Amino acid sequence: MPRVLIEEDYAARRNEILDIARKLVYTKGYEQMSIQDILDEMKISKGAFYHYFDSKPALLEALVDRLADEAEAKFIPLLNDPALPALEKLCRYFSSAVQWKATQKDYMLALLRIWYSDENALTRQKVFAIMLQRIAPSFTSVIQQGVQEGTLCTSFPDQATEISLYLILGLGDKFGEIILGHEAGAVQLSAEERFQIMQKAVAAYTDALERVLGASAGSIQVMDDASIRVWVD
């Protein structure tokens, strides 16, 4: 069989396993899902599974990586659109990312519940490093464009990109902390109280982002109130 066909067959089979795993994360939860569940669904042997993934954590990493692939394909073209000014690129990027996550809220929440467990700390760090590598070039180009247009002001576009992406990650961590704390009963807050905490977090991180990029106050919107409520309700 030609090498191209072998590679296509391998990719197709691997994606089939990921499709089943994603479904099981929805229906059973990652912690309850076993490799045997996947074998039973696909009618394959354990050896066949390990041909594609060497462990359950490797499967989780692949699920997140595929989600990152989807995000990259959807959002990088926005950052690279030559017809848009820099600030509009940033605002559209944030708005589209927020809407995209909201459309698959249940899956995001299922991943969130396992993503912040201690045993996945290394995987989390690794995936963020990969995301930084993927997004950074386009993000830096937008910052450089904004500096040329006079809407952004920084002498360090590369470093500003890294700091900006860490701020975005930090905001996501804050949301995760609030959501998971509420689910676990560790934080007894009303929906309105959670909304207000998230609202303040968005305002604070947005302010920090504008300062890092040298943007005027109120020129960047990371997340609106309606989108925040999606994660409170």
Predicted segments — roles?
Residues 103-140, 144, 148-151, 157-161, ...:
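Short secondary-structure transition hinges
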Residues 133-149, 167, 173-233:
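C-terminal peripheral helix-coil segments that are non-catalytic and often amphipathic
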